[in-house]
Amino acid sequence: RLLRDRLAAGPVSLAVDIETTFHRGESRMLVAEFPGAARPDERVVLVAHVQEPGANDDASGCGTLLAAVLAMRQAIAAGAVAPPDRTITVLWGDEIRGSQHWLDADPARAAGVIAMMSLDMTGENTALTGGTFLIEKGPDPSAVHDRPSDPHTEWGAGEVDPAWVRGHYLNDLHLGVCLREARDTGWVVRTNPYEGGSDHTSFTRAGVPALLNWHFTDRYYHTNLDTPDKTSPEEMGHVARAVATTALFLGSVGPVDREPLLALVREAERARLETERRNAASEEILEAWRTWYAQARASVEALR
């Protein structure tokens, strides 16, 4: 009542002291797996983080990942696809710390990871939130060389260890899957250079080919206005289908897939070099891309 009376009389300024404490506690992680039928010690890992309280960040990522898992389970149970040769491991936990703990807890297990995808803010109703769906690529030369054809998001460029910039087919494979999903639906798919800040960071630092599925920029990001009315089931469906498709392909990719994968990577290399030449890239940048794509082709040729 006193505060109401003061407010009725005019503007009121408040000074507030808040006492807080920090303490250690347990952090739980939910782990689900599709056991590998032929190479169970080799793994594809999918991750969404649970600790952010927003609807898009990251309830939508957790829900999208669950939808992808249920779709894979249904397809395998129905005989539409074969069980994966490799184990597909699914993690819901604390962002970055949870992923790092999973990697550190069993180095032998971590050594078997062939690829990882993170799902973060995957359910945006972009008409309300702004931004678009993005694939944040595993580190390639665009993470080091700022180019007009490959701009960073408002999140901003992060520090990149040169050792992380190693070519792999994962970027172009997942982009191709997403573009196929978009072909008949009008889904907007774009990419951005590696920036870090979600669960793919832990795996990238560990030398694992990794990428992020997300949306940015979101005008409600990290505010109490990140609410369910700003999510889109259709957008979550697009991401879930693309992630499930890529994960199942990675789960059994082998020598029989070399030629189509090589064709995909070669076409991506051709398009990239053409774009960089058109934008007057230096010879240093062109050579960086040639090197990266040579490594990406080698990652395909190494399939066994």
What kind of feature is each model-predicted range?
Residues 54-63, 233, 237:
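Short, conserved micro-motifs enriched in small and acidic residues
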Residues 21-24, 37-39, 50-54, 94-99, ...:
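Solvent-exposed loop/turn segments at secondary-structure junctions
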Residues 39-41, 93-212, 232-234:
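Metal-dependent peptidase/peptidase-like ectodomains
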Residues 71-101, 109:
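Short helix-loop-beta-strand segments that form the rim/entrance of peptidase-like active sites
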Residues 1-56, 67-80, 87:
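Soluble metallo-hydrolase cores and metallopeptidase-like ectodomains found primarily
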Residues 256-304:
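Acidic, Ser/Thr-rich low-complexity intrinsically disordered segments
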Residues 4-8, 70-77, 104-108, 179-183, ...:
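Sec-exported extracytoplasmic/periplasmic mature domains
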Residues 86, 219-270:
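His/Asp/Glu-rich mid-to-C-terminal helical/loop segments that flank catalytic regions of hydrolases
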